[in-house]
Amino acid sequence: MLEEGEHVLVAVSGGIDSMTLLYVLRKFSPLLKIKITAAHLDHRIRESSRRDREFVERICRQWNIPVETSEVDVPSLWKDSGKTLEEIAREVRYDFLKRTAKKVGASKIALAHHKNDLLETVVHRLIRGTGPLGLACISPKREEFIRPFLVFKRSEIEEYARKNNVPYVVDETNYNVKYTRNFIRHRIVPLMKELNPTVEDAVYRLVSVTHLLRNFVERTVQDFVERNVYFYKDYAVFVEPEDLFLFLEVTRWVLKEMYGRVPEYEKLIGTLKSKRVELWSGIFVERSFGYVAVGKTVFKKKYRVEVKGDMLEMEGFKIRVVNNRNDMKFWVRNRKEGDRIIVNGRERKLKDVFIEKKVPTFYRDRVPLLVDEEDRVLWVPGIARSDFLPEDVVVELLEYPVGYVKGGTYFEQV
């Protein structure tokens, strides 16, 4: 967790947990051969917050510890944010800690979370709604953040603080149950402890195992993504995994990579009942013929381009057209309602051809079709060549999105 010679930034609110952490790291810093700096952020949520800041500064002077302080008007940021006050405060606090660590040259940021914090977070997530991996919520070490006290209960930290006369201030809002975290701490956890006095230890073991599970899932998903996920301009496509949980996690990974957010599991599970589910405005998950498309899968744009050169590229397709006829002109467009193609004297609806050849639904409106001056469909890439397309006109499909031509590069003629 800590290595010799490291500089550690200690997040200090002034409360008993963080003050005890600062006391312990100061006491053992000569033995560990580490340098420590304290960091305190005034959120301006309480009238007494200035008192806390002055207290931290005074104790740090007494203990000869460098301290970095700042203040942010969190209530102002909270207005119209759509988030809870606790969420905004947390975001602001972590941003402050990261910036301060960079400023002072600290390689680690120490936080005073303990087993009771872990228990409260698990209960909070269960109430709010979370997936199984959401229980892997607070880890002893993640990126630059470390939590040396995570193996201790709040009662153990408080007992140590009393024995060593660690100074601290009391945040009066910690007892206000209008805040979700406090309600859990003062109303729900005591009931849980009536059923199991060591519930903190039980949850700690659960979360520890869940961290191992999450690490395994993350490696599995990363391996799948590297081998199977293809990103295009505004969507991604991959082979649908046979395992439902892997499908959910890969889809969530892709969405987070593309949009920085993930939907609830329930919405993704909905894709198993409906082939297309809209997650957010214009953002879909669509399953078709063994492939999954994520993103802006619904293609509404209409295009029509005259063929003037040999090569054309559009919507992930690359085609080559060699027109040896001076008396004919050709265009490339995407499909429209009622399109048909005649092959070997038989007229077929283009829609039926796509279904027969198992072209995923999310590609059908993107496919570049070769048409003549009468707007007749003469060629469908990799699928069909019309009787009306002269033999001395060469057309080739050179590149196409993954899964468009299933199982090969060219189908037999329909």
Swiss-Prot record:
Pfam families: ATP_bind_3, TilS_C. It catalyses: cytidine(34) in tRNA(Ile2) + L-lysine + ATP = lysidine(34) in tRNA(Ile2) + AMP + diphosphate + H(+). ATP binds at S13, G14, G15, I16, D17, S18. Its EC number is 6.3.4.19. InterPro entries: Lysidine-tRNA-synth_C, Rossmann-like_a/b/a_fold, TilS/TtcA_N, tRNA_Ile_lys_synt, tRNA_Ile_lys_synt_N. This is tRNA(Ile)-lysidine synthase. It comes from Thermotoga maritima (strain ATCC 43589 / DSM 3109 / JCM 10099 / NBRC 100826 / MSB8). It is an enzyme of class 6 (ligase). Ligates lysine onto the cytidine present at position 34 of the AUA codon-specific tRNA(Ile) that contains the anticodon CAU, in an ATP-dependent manner. Cytidine is converted to lysidine, thus changing the amino acid specificity of the tRNA from methionine to isoleucine. Belongs to the tRNA(Ile)-lysidine synthase family. Disulfide bonds: none annotated. One of its GO terms (cellular component) is cytoplasm. One of its GO terms (molecular function) is tRNA(Ile)-lysidine synthase activity. It is found in: Cytoplasm. The N-terminal region contains the highly conserved SGGXDS motif, predicted to be a P-loop motif involved in ATP binding. GO terms for biological process: tRNA modification. Keywords: ATP-binding, Cytoplasm, Ligase, Nucleotide-binding, tRNA processing. The keyword ATP-binding applies. SUPFAM superfamilies: Adenine nucleotide alpha hydrolases-like, PheT/TilS domain.
